[in-house]
């Protein structure tokens, strides 16, 4: 019985590193290799929030030492951020961060792209983005849309 109580008292220390570091590290590696940017947003946002929590803890550790529930609160919050069924970091990104950060703000320089066009450009690698931007500057966005439609039409044939 004493063993179970000891585990319950240190549950945060046993589970915390796996939830707060190991799984996010693994998922971040997978996100880097995936073609979509949605998981990149999830994990970049997670690491930013986790860093802010760590800075907060380091700044006020003397106060937090007096709060016995702090490690459990932190664990629950990080579980909410990490677990795929909640995707809390993605929620924070889409509902709070995105309001203050313009999507594709570094895309297109002074060119007036629509939000949809910026999203398309943002999903590309830097080299591809530069090539498409040069093409758009020379021929206009309509020619890019025509090329995309032609490629989609060609894909349907096969």
Curated annotation (Swiss-Prot):
Disulfide bonds: none
Chief subcellular location: membrane
Record key words, sorted: Membrane, Transmembrane, Transmembrane helix
Subcellular location field: Membrane
Membrane topology: Multi-pass membrane protein
A GO CC term attached to the entry: membrane
InterPro entries: TB2_DP1_HVA22 (IPR004345)
Segments passing through the bilayer: 2-22, 41-61, 63-83
Taxonomic superkingdom: Eukaryota
Family per similarity comment: Belongs to the DP1 family.
Name this protein carries in UniProt: HVA22-like protein f
Species whose genome carries this gene: Arabidopsis thaliana
Organism ancestry: Eukaryota, Viridiplantae, Streptophyta, Embryophyta, Tracheophyta
